[in-house]
Amino acid sequence: VFLHGYGQSRMGWMTTPDGREGWSTSFLRKGHGVFLVDQPRRGEAGSTAAMTTDSIDTWSEDSKEYMPGDQAWYTHFRIGRVAPERYEGSQFPAGEEAQDQFFRQMTPNTGSFDITVAAAAMDEVMNDVYEMTGQKSIYVTHSQGGAVGWEVDPENVAAIVAIEPGGTPEIGSEQYNALLGANIPIVIYFGDYIDNGSEDIQSTSFWRTVRDTAVQFAESYNA
């Protein structure tokens, strides 16, 4: 079961900005059942243009309602400092067409993000998948979807794969104890350009904090 991150939809699992096969097809080819989910109040109507008060700013105190512009996405995803420049060694597809398709995948909310609503919806998804397959699901989350992943009832979860989650459960919290008590295997992945990002981009410090907190979480969870 795959859940996308903020500003995205299930399309991010289905293809790449340069048109290659996405995660879902790769897993299907290996014989796995794949279930792609759009968060409540999201959808597949991606952006062709978006307004923002600051095209460089990548974070906001009002982030639940904030819809960054193209440049903000570019820096927050750590592709480069200013589009179309890319960080040295970046594996993001080169060229204007891939960049344009990446921006078009960004999808605004139709309402505010409510983690309780999203987690309840994902609980139903996990229950439905179990009824269909008779098996617990490996839950793959990305970014904001990671926060939802920690909130889901672990009853029908076989494992969690968190791709750059926007946060991890506080050690000793209800979510932490529920996962630990259910003995859920967890693997967390972070990409590159976290420690060498531009200091004047607020999301640079955000990703460092999130990554460092995830390391602390993993050390405690595996102790």
Regions from the PLM with identified roles:
Residues F2-A83:
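Short, surface-exposed "cap/lid" segments of acyl-processing enzymes
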Residues V34, S137, I186, A223:
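Hydrophobic anchor at the start of a short beta-strand
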Residues A159-N222:
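The feature captures the conserved acid-bearing segment of alpha/beta-hydrolase catalytic domains
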Residues F27, V152-D153:
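Aromatic pocket-lining residues of Rossmann-like dinucleotide-binding sites
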Residues V140-G149:
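Gly/Ala-rich beta-loop-alpha elbow adjacent to hydrolase catalytic centers
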Residues L3-G5, D38, H142, E164, ...:
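The conserved beta1-alpha1 loop
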Residues M67-F113:
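Extended, charge-rich helix/loop segments that form flexible
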Residues I115-S137:
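Conserved acidic catalytic loop of the alpha/beta-hydrolase fold
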